[in-house]
From Swiss-Prot:
It comes from Desulfitobacterium hafniense (strain DSM 10664 / DCB-2). The keyword rRNA-binding applies. InterPro entries: Nucleotide-bd_a/b_plait_sf, Ribosomal_uL23-like, Ribosomal_uL23/eL15/eS24_sf, Ribosomal_uL23_CS. This is Large ribosomal subunit protein uL23. One of its GO terms (cellular component) is ribosome. PROSITE patterns: RIBOSOMAL_L23 (PS00050). One of its GO terms (molecular function) is rRNA binding. One of the early assembly proteins it binds 23S rRNA. One of the proteins that surrounds the polypeptide exit tunnel on the outside of the ribosome. Forms the main docking site for trigger factor binding to the ribosome. Belongs to the universal ribosomal protein uL23 family. One of its GO terms (biological process) is translation. The keyword Protein biosynthesis does not apply. Keywords: Ribonucleoprotein, Ribosomal protein, RNA-binding, rRNA-binding. Pfam families: Ribosomal_L23. Part of the 50S ribosomal subunit. Contacts protein L29, and trigger factor when it is bound to the ribosome.
Length: 95
């Protein structure tokens, strides 16, 4: 089993993700190889909450140019985690 800090990279801070907090849904950037069970276990272990649902989205990297050179940013994976009613993650409270 991988460490929870290897699975969860950082929270997603955007207008949409902050709006989802009211519905008890929290968004995280996660490791691209992580599956839903690993994400659920990592959130429950790190934040001491009960996870009801995990949804994942694979986000393709964007094409970038510097002069005549074309490259891409890295592909990422986002997870939207729904918590049991009444549970909260305190780090997101001020958003």
């Amino acid at each position: 089993m991988r460490d929870a800090r290897d699975v969860l990279k950082r929270p997603v801070i955007s207008e949409k993700s902050v709006g989802l907090i009211e519905e008890n849904k929290y968004s995280f950037w996660v490791d691209t190889a992580a599956n839903k069970i690993e994400i659920k276990n990592a959130v429950e272990k790190m934040f001491k909450v009960k996870v009801v649902d995990v949804r994942t989205i694979n986000v393709d990297g964007k094409k970038k140019r510097v002069g005549k050179h074309v490259g891409r940013t890295a592909d990422r994976k986002k997870a939207i985690v729904t918590l049991k009613a009444g549970d909260r993650i305190e780090g997101f409270a001020g958003l």
